């Protein structure tokens, strides 16, 4: 009886013991000042899975065995922060962890190199990026011994973290599955050779969101917004559609709305889903150039999403080449939706289809379009008109939605006409 009671008490005592959770290094300005005289560099790996979302665990146990929550058959995301001049924890970190684990059943490893990124000497943090990459490569070699695969590794690096990801990729000769650079740091990297910065050759698939041109690129508005755009693309139901183009100037005047090269997958999307276009993008690299540059516009606040449509017009004959047409988009309530049109001055020729890219701020059902024709001359022309054979509106953001049409329209000068839209003829869908 005494033995039985003793064993029960032992079991109770053990079950009451709580596991210690790892925490991101909490540093401050004092640590930045201390670094001026005593430089430090430490790296910690904090592992999360859906089994331990609220409690970060070490990737390896004290005996160097692999954490039992790590599944070598699943994708592994490595999240690497950047320069932290006053040692603060990245404000986006916890939210990023949540949206990534909500999106996919993965191994998620936060690379905490705050002791090394926290310094007033930016150049020192830059030099530490290569050292962190070497430390990471040692842990990766250990994972490979346990059966992990480089092809399943997706590095997401922010600022200096993007270049750390690139240096890791170089160590493994470009065999990492994917690297995503979110606003890669420019100072001390811009203009450098491919060996000294993140490069498209550092992984099998490299995508970058920043304000310069490189890799498969998405153009953004301001510093570090890339992080929030990437998260928004995960959290919202909006497709952040982007358009392949040689320059932002050409994109703005509507010269780059053709995504036929991307086949049935339509235009590529920003963020986590960009890898759906991996095979097509690699094929484009082999056939044409070393990288694909794409553009998109966003709103200034979360969730940042806008909605793209292509408005195509086919005229019956060449009527007034010196005129232009204005457009209004009306929703089902008859309210005008603000639209941005990407277009240049275009002459209309018989049975030629002219496409205009339109961007709306709201995801609404467009029920009608208002058109007004103006000629360039100041003199009123009562006989001037455009004869439109077909007008078609198709969503680019949601290509699965059927296009809407109207047929046989005559526009007189300065006279606004509202056209109700309905399903297009079967042969045109």
Q: What do the PLM-derived regions correspond to, one by one?
A:
Residues 110-112, 181:
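A short glycine-rich beta-strand->turn/loop micro-motif centered on a GG-aromatic cluster
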Residues 2-110, 117-128, 138-150, 196-200, ...:
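Flexible, membrane-associating and regulatory peripheral segments of lipid-active enzymes
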Residues 177, 181-217:
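The feature captures the conserved acid-bearing segment of alpha/beta-hydrolase catalytic domains
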Residues 147-159, 179:
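Alpha/beta-hydrolase fold nucleophile elbow
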Residues 83-86, 114-118, 160-162, 185-188, ...:
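Solvent-exposed loop/turn segments at secondary-structure junctions
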Residues 135-140, 206:
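Short, well-ordered amphipathic alpha-helical segments that serve as non-catalytic structural scaffolds
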Residues 81, 155-168:
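Glycine-rich nucleophile elbow surrounding the catalytic serine of serine-hydrolase chemistry
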Residues 104, 172-175, 202:
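Short, structured coil segments at secondary-structure junctions
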């Amino acid at each position: 009886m005494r033995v039985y009671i003793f064993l029960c008490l032992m079991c109770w005592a053990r079950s009451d013991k709580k596991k210690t959770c790892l925490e991101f290094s909490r540093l401050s300005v004092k640590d930045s000042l201390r670094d001026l005289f005593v430089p430090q560099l430490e790296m910690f790996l904090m592992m999360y899975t859906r089994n331990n979302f609220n409690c970060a665990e070490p990737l390896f146990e004290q005996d160097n065995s692999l954490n039992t929550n790590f599944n070598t058959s699943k994708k592994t995301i490595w999240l690497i922060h950047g320069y932290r001049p006053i040692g603060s924890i990245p404000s986006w970190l916890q939210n990023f962890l949540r949206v990534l684990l909500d999106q996919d059943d993965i191994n998620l490893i936060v690379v905490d190199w705050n002791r090394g990124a926290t310094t007033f000497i930016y150049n020192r943090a830059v030099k530490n990026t290569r050292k962190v990459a070497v430390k990471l490569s040692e842990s990766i070699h250990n994972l490979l011994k346990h059966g992990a695969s480089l092809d399943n590794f997706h590095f997401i690096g922010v600022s200096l973290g993007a270049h750390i990801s690139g240096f890791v990729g170089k160590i493994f000769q470009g065999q990492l599955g994917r690297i995503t650079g979110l606003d890669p740091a420019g100072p001390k990297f811009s203009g450098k050779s491919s060996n000294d910065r993140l490069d498209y050759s550092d992984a099998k698939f490299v995508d970058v969101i920043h304000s310069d041109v490189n890799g498969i690129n998405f153009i953004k508005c301001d510093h570090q917004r890339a992080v929030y755009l990437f998260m928004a693309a995960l959290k919202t139901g909006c497709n952040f559609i982007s358009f392949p183009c040689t320059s932002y100037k050409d994109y703005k005047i509507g010269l780059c709305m053709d995504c036929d090269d991307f086949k049935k997958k339509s235009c590529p999307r920003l963020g986590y889903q960009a890898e759906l276009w991996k095979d097509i993008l690699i094929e484009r690299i082999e056939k044409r150039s070393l990288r694909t540059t794409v553009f998109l516009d966003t709103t200034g606040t979360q969730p940042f999403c806008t909605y793209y449509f292509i408005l195509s017009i086919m005229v019956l004959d060449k009527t007034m080449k010196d005129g232009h047409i204005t457009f209004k988009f009306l929703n089902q309530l008859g309210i005008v939706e603000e639209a941005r049109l990407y277009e240049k001055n275009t002459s209309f020729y018989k049975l030629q289809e002219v496409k205009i890219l339109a961007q709306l701020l709201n995801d609404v059902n467009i029920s009608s379009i208002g058109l007004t024709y103006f000629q360039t001359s100041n003199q009123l022309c009562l006989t001037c008109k455009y004869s439109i054979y077909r007008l078609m509106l198709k969503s680019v953001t949601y290509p699965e939605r059927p296009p809407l049409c109207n047929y046989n329209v005559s526009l007189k000068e300065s006279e606004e006409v509202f056209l109700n839209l309905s399903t297009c003829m079967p042969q045109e869908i």
